Curated annotation (Swiss-Prot):
Location, primary (coarse class): cytoplasm
One Gene Ontology CC term in the entry: MKS complex
PROSITE patterns in alphabetical order: C2_B9
Superkingdom assignment: Eukaryota
Domain C2 B9-type: 9-127
Any one biological process term the GO annotation gives: embryonic digit morphogenesis
Protein name: B9 domain-containing protein 1
Organism (species): Mus musculus (Mouse)
Keyword list, A-Z: Cell projection, Cilium, Cilium biogenesis/degradation, Cytoplasm, Cytoskeleton
Amino acid sequence: MAAASPSVFLLMITGQVESAQFPEYDDLYCKYCFVYGQDWAPTAGLEEGISQIASKSQDVRQALVWNFPIDVTFKSTNPYGWPQIVLSVYGPDVFGNDVVRGYGAVHVPLSPGRHKRTIPMFVPESTSTLQKFTSWFMGRRPEYTDPKVVAQGEGREVTRVRSQGFVTLLFNVVTKDMKKLGYDTGPVDTQGVLGPSLPQGNPQ
């Protein structure tokens, strides 16, 4: 008797939120979560996490190193809604309040293999000088009530943002049964791991 053909494929993601560069800030931590379509479902691992607080390195790079692990497996019947990882970086202001220092998002790489991505980060801005001063004085900076909005297009065109900082991610991607369902993800890709990485996932 022939084996039944698979009805779903699997996407396995491991890796780490490696490091960040925020020249103006120190003592930062990072939160991550995954955003995906309605046909996707997590089957193992963690969809979200929060790192430890990292301080800048003492060398010329002044990197904030987290090396925070990512490990999650998804199943789906079609590629629509391919998972994105959303990052939110937080740190103290001059009054000791935790405020957002950057948002960013990038799709999980499509091809199996080891990948490196550098994500430009951004923060929402107040629309007037008075609002900027009030938010600074009260310690309540503009931020999204749900960081997952960063991975979506709706309403983004009316949001005023400012770029600041970069976060570097390492992905190890494994797929299962995609070819059996007729999807070709191409050859194993290691682009950006051996050589210098370029910013990916610019805010729209």
